[in-house]
Structure formats: structure tokens, C-alpha cells
């Protein structure tokens, strides 16, 4: 499956995307800093399905900051072999063991619980 095919599934889990400029504005940084945060696995930046430019799922930003615990969670998911697309699918898909979506648990400051779930992904 191509990366484009992989991204098509994100339409069903990510409701709202921010352009790079919008994400930068919400974070109070430059677009190049947003790209750097992505390279550092602190944030996910990619081309959304049907999108023309790079974008960030809006729910990864809360109160002008990257959601607390997101970076550590993305690192764990990457270490388990998940791509950025797969990581977003996991974050935005309900998990009955939490309960709810991992992104919601992170937004509720339950990062440790989310990372424990991420560590057992095979």
C-alpha cells in the first residue's frame, strides 16, 4: 500500500487539520519550527488526504502548546515501528482499555497511561 493509500484512512479519524501556518500561529512559532518539531517526533506534520500542503491534526495542539505527552508517545510508537500515519490512526482510534481515544487521554493529561498502551503494540 502506498503512503497516499495509508493517508486516505486518516479522513475517518482526524476531523480537523491545520495548515502549517495555522499550526505555527497557534503555537506562537514559525512554520519552520513546526517542521522541526515534526523531525524531533514532538508533532506530526504530513499531507492530509486530499490536501495540497503540509498540515497538523488540530487536536495535537491544546492551549497554544503541543499536547503534553505527545512527543514521548510518538517516540514510543516510532520505536514500535509505526509510521506517522499509523501513529495518527492509533492516536485517533478508540481504545476500550483506556477507554476512549489515546489523543483524548493525552489531552486529559493521562500520558503515562497512553504510553503504557503504546509500549505493548506488536
Language-model-derived ranges and their functions:
Residues 1-122:
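Non-transmembrane "mature" sequence context
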Amino acid at each position: 500500500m502506498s503512503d497516499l493509500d495509508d493517508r486516505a484512512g486518516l479522513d475517518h479519524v482526524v476531523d480537523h487539520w491545520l495548515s502549517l501556518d495555522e499550526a505555527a500561529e497557534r503555537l506562537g512559532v514559525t512554520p519552520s519550527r513546526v517542521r522541526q518539531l515534526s523531525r524531533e517526533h514532538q508533532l506530526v506534520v504530513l499531507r492530509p488526504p486530499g490536501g495540497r500542503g503540509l498540515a497538523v491534526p488540530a487536536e495535537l495542539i491544546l492551549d497554544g502548546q503541543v499536547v503534553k505527552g505527545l512527543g514521548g508517545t510518538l517516540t514510543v510508537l516510532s520505536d514500535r515501528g509505526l509510521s506517522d500515519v499509523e501513529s495518527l490512526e492509533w492516536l485517533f482510534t478508540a481504545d476500550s482499555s483506556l477507554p476512549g481515544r489515546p489523543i483524548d487521554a493525552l489531552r486529559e493529561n493521562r500520558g503515562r497511561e497512553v504510553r503504557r498502551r503504546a509500549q505493548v503494540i506488536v
